[in-house]
Amino acid sequence: MAKRTFSNLETFLIFLLVMMSAITVALLSLLFITSGTIENHKDLGGHFFSTTQSPPATQGSTAAQRSTATQHSTATQSSTATQTSPVPLTPESPLFQNFSGYHIGVGRADCTGQVADINLMGYGKSGQNAQGILTRLYSRAFIMAEPDGSNRTVFVSIDIGMVSQRLRLEVLNRLQSKYGSLYRRDNVILSGTHTHSGPAGYFQYTVFVIASEGFSNQTFQHMVTGILKSIDIAHTNMKPGKIFINKGNVDGVQINRSPYSYLQNPQSERARYSSNTDKEMIVLKMVDLNGDDLGLISWFAIHPVSMNNSNHLVNSDNVGYASYLLEQEKNKGYLPGQGPFVAAFASSNLGDVSPNILGPRCINTGESCDNANSTCPIGGPSMCIAKGPGQDMFDSTQIIGRAMYQRAKELYASASQEVTGPLASAHQWVDMTDVTVWLNSTHASKTCKPALGYSFAAGTIDGVGGLNFTQGKTEGDPFWDTIRDQILGKPSEEIKECHKPKPILLHTGELSKPHPWHPDIVDVQIITLGSLAITAIPGEFTTMSGRRLREAVQAEFASHGMQNMTVVISGLCNVYTHYITTYEEYQAQRYEAASTIYGPHTLSAYIQLFRNLAKAIATDTVANLSRGPEPPFFKQLIVPLIPSIVDRAPKGRTFGDVLQPAKPEYRVGEVAEVIFVGANPKNSVQNQTHQTFLTVEKYEATSTSWQIVCNDASWETRFYWHKGLLGLSNATVEWHIPDTAQPGIYRIRYFGHNRKQDILKPAVILSFEGTSPAFEVVTI
C-alpha cells in the first residue's frame, strides 16, 4: 500500500496526546467493548498445503497452538452466503473428446461499492474521501481447466487497492457453498490491481481499519458479490480454447521511486539488468477453437498512482484505463463493462515502481529532489513530489494507460507460443512472524513480529506524509517515541532487535486491541499452467525482490525436471502485508523498507516457501503437504466514522431536479455540465435499482428514441457529489465530449437513491432520476 497510509493514525496519536489520559482511557474502553470473537476458516475442500525446508523453514509453537485451537467452522460464519447444493464435479464431455487444449471461461462484474462518504484506499490521506465516480471498478475472472473439466485454476484481477484476508476468506466460503470443492484455496488466486482510487473499508486488521476510517459492510459485501459474479460468469461461459503467451518491453512509463535503495543491491547483481525497473510485460492470449478472442491477462510492474492523493473520484487508474481501451476495442457496440471480451491488466512487482515519470521535484522551487531522503531545502520532504507526463492527473492516467494498452494489444496480436501441459496448484498458510530462514547450510535467522518503521510515515514521492517524517531514517525520534509509548506502550527489546536497522514507529505485532493490528498468518500460493507459473504474492515486491523470487522459483522447477518455466510475479494477492524489499534495500530504510513488516529476512523467507511449493508441484507431492495454520475471521469490527443521515431536497424542489442546465450548444472537445438536486450516492449500494449514476443519450430521429452513448463507466464522464448541510446535496454530471462524438441532439440523465426515514419507522432507500433539457453537439 503505497504512500502515507498512516496519516490518520498520526492525527489520532496527536489528538490523544493533547486530550491526555481521560480520553485515552475512554478510547481503550471502547476498543475492548468492540472486540469481537474470532472464527477460523476450516478446510474449504481439496488439499491445502504447507511446506518444509531443507534445511526446514520452521513454524514456532505459537503457530502450532493457533492451528489446533477449537473454533467455529466458517461454513456457518457468513449469514449472507447463499446456501445452495454444491455443483457436482463432473467431466464435461463430450465437449473435450479428442481435444488437447484447455477449457476457458472469462467473466467480468461490477465491484465498485460506495462512491461517497468512504475513504479511498491507498494513500491513507485523512480527508481523501470519495465524492463521486470517474470509472466503475470491475472484477475480472479467468478459469482454465484441463480437457476433462475436473482440474482447473482461477485467476481473478480486481480493481481494488489490494485483496484483504477477510475478502478472500469470505469469497472462498461462498464458493464452497455453491461449488463444493471445485474452487478452493489452492486453485483460486485473487489479485488487486492496486488502484489508489477505490473505496476502503473492507479490512479486518486494525492498521487498515484505521486507515479506512472504519469497516464498511456495504462496500465489503458489494466487492464479494462482484468477485463471485465474475467467477460465476466465467464458470457458465467455459468453452474449449487455446492459450498463448507473449512477452515484450514497455518503455517510457515507469521510474524507480527509490533508486538509492536499489543501489544497495550488489553491483554484480545490478549489472545483469539494463534498468532499475522491470520493463517486461507478459501477456496471456485466450481464444476459442475458432480463433475468436476470449480474453487477455497482462502482468506488468507499475503503481496505479497516476491519480494523485488530491483525487476524490472512484476510478481504476492507469491499469484500469488500459483495460477500458482494450475491452472497448474488442467489444464494439457495447457500453463499458459489457461485452464478452475481458482484459485484465494485473499487478506485478511494483513496490518501487512509479508512473510519475517526470520524477521528484520540489513543488515550491522546481528543483530536483531525487536524493536519498527525498527532501527539499525549503519545506523538507512534504515538498518533494513526482508528477506524471500529462497536464493533470487525468491526462497522465490516459498517457500511461494508453501506452500499456498499445503494447498489450501488439503482444496479443503477435502471440504465437502456445501454453500446453497440465494444471497444478499449491497453497500454504504460513505464520510469517516465526519462519526460520536459512542463510546457508549452517546459519539461520528468523522473521519478526510485524512492525512499521519511521520512514513509513514519510510516504513516498507519489504521495508524501502529512507530518515532517523523512525517508531513510535509521534512528527514532524521542518526541514520537514518547507519544507512542504513552498511548500504545513500549515496543519490546526483542522486536526492536529483530527489525534492526529499522527504528520502530509502530510495533503492530505486539498490539492486539481491538483486534491484531497486522496479520500473522499469510497465504503463499503457486498456480501452474503447463510451462507458466503464477506466484501469488501477498504484498508489494520491489523490482529486485521480484527478480530474485522469479529466478529462485524457476531454478527450483528446473532442478526437478521442469525446464524453461516462465514465472510470473502476481502482486497484491490474497492478503495484504505491505512491502517486501531485499535484505540490502532494507538497510537503507526508505519507505518500502520501513513497510517490510516481518523484518530484514522477509524476502528470504518467501523465497524458501515458494521454492518448496514449486518443488511439491514438480515432484507431484502436493497432496502430502499440510495446509498450515488457519487465519482468523473477526466478526465485529469498528463501524464507519461517517454516519448515514436522511437526504433532503431544497424547499420547492425534489430529488433529480435540474438546478443548472447544460448550454444549448457545445463543440466536440468541450465539457457539457448539468447540476441536479442530489442525494448521497452511497445509498445506491443498498438499493441497486439503477446500475449507473448517469447516462449521456443521443436522440435518433429514425427511431424517435434516445440511445445511451455513455454512462458512469465511460472515461469521458465524471460524476461529482457535493455534500451540503443537514442532508442537502447537489450532483454535477460532466461529459467531456470526445472528438469521436457524432453531431446531434443529446441529453444527460442522473440516477440516484435518497434515504428517507419517518418518525418511529426504519429508514428506506428510494430511487429517483432526473433529466436535463436537450442540447446540441456540433463538430465545427
From Swiss-Prot:
<dbReference type="GO" id="GO:0000139">
    <property type="term" value="C:Golgi membrane"/>
</dbReference>
<feature type="glycosylation site" description="O-linked (GalNAc...) threonine">
    <location>
        <position position="84"/>
    </location>
</feature>
<feature type="glycosylation site" description="N-linked (GlcNAc...) asparagine">
    <location>
        <position position="564"/>
    </location>
</feature>
<feature type="glycosylation site" description="N-linked (GlcNAc...) asparagine">
    <location>
        <position position="440"/>
    </location>
</feature>
<dbReference type="GO" id="GO:0006672">
    <property type="term" value="P:ceramide metabolic process"/>
</dbReference>
<feature type="glycosylation site" description="O-linked (GalNAc...) threonine">
    <location>
        <position position="70"/>
    </location>
</feature>
<feature type="glycosylation site" description="N-linked (GlcNAc...) asparagine">
    <location>
        <position position="98"/>
    </location>
</feature>
<keyword id="KW-0378">Hydrolase</keyword>
<feature type="region of interest" description="Required for correct folding and localization">
    <location>
        <begin position="770"/>
        <end position="780"/>
    </location>
</feature>
<dbReference type="GO" id="GO:0007346">
    <property type="term" value="P:regulation of mitotic cell cycle"/>
</dbReference>
<feature type="binding site">
    <location>
        <position position="194"/>
    </location>
    <ligand>
        <name>Zn(2+)</name>
    </ligand>
</feature>
<feature type="topological domain" description="Lumenal">
    <location>
        <begin position="34"/>
        <end position="780"/>
    </location>
</feature>
<dbReference type="GO" id="GO:0046514">
    <property type="term" value="P:ceramide catabolic process"/>
</dbReference>
<keyword id="KW-0472">Membrane</keyword>
<feature type="glycosylation site" description="O-linked (GalNAc...) threonine">
    <location>
        <position position="62"/>
    </location>
</feature>
<keyword id="KW-0832">Ubl conjugation</keyword>
<dbReference type="GO" id="GO:0005509">
    <property type="term" value="F:calcium ion binding"/>
</dbReference>
<feature type="site" description="Cleavage">
    <location>
        <begin position="98"/>
        <end position="99"/>
    </location>
</feature>
<feature type="disulfide bond">
    <location>
        <begin position="362"/>
        <end position="376"/>
    </location>
</feature>
<dbReference type="Pfam" id="PF04734">
    <property type="entry name" value="Ceramidase_alk"/>
</dbReference>
<feature type="glycosylation site" description="O-linked (GalNAc...) threonine">
    <location>
        <position position="76"/>
    </location>
</feature>
<feature type="binding site">
    <location>
        <position position="134"/>
    </location>
    <ligand>
        <name>Ca(2+)</name>
    </ligand>
</feature>
<comment type="pathway">
    <text>Lipid metabolism; sphingolipid metabolism.</text>
</comment>
<dbReference type="GO" id="GO:0042759">
    <property type="term" value="P:long-chain fatty acid biosynthetic process"/>
</dbReference>
<keyword id="KW-0862">Zinc</keyword>
<dbReference type="GO" id="GO:0044241">
    <property type="term" value="P:lipid digestion"/>
</dbReference>
<feature type="topological domain" description="Cytoplasmic">
    <location>
        <begin position="1"/>
        <end position="12"/>
    </location>
</feature>
<dbReference type="GO" id="GO:0005901">
    <property type="term" value="C:caveola"/>
</dbReference>
<feature type="transmembrane region" description="Helical; Signal-anchor for type II membrane protein">
    <location>
        <begin position="13"/>
        <end position="33"/>
    </location>
</feature>
<feature type="disulfide bond">
    <location>
        <begin position="448"/>
        <end position="498"/>
    </location>
</feature>
<keyword id="KW-0479">Metal-binding</keyword>
<feature type="binding site">
    <location>
        <position position="712"/>
    </location>
    <ligand>
        <name>Ca(2+)</name>
    </ligand>
</feature>
<dbReference type="InterPro" id="IPR031331">
    <property type="entry name" value="NEUT/ALK_ceramidase_C"/>
</dbReference>
<keyword id="KW-0746">Sphingolipid metabolism</keyword>
<feature type="glycosylation site" description="O-linked (GalNAc...) serine">
    <location>
        <position position="79"/>
    </location>
</feature>
<dbReference type="GO" id="GO:0005886">
    <property type="term" value="C:plasma membrane"/>
</dbReference>
<dbReference type="GO" id="GO:0017040">
    <property type="term" value="F:N-acylsphingosine amidohydrolase activity"/>
</dbReference>
<keyword id="KW-0496">Mitochondrion</keyword>
<feature type="disulfide bond">
    <location>
        <begin position="369"/>
        <end position="384"/>
    </location>
</feature>
<dbReference type="GO" id="GO:0070062">
    <property type="term" value="C:extracellular exosome"/>
</dbReference>
<keyword id="KW-0964">Secreted</keyword>
<feature type="glycosylation site" description="N-linked (GlcNAc...) asparagine">
    <location>
        <position position="730"/>
    </location>
</feature>
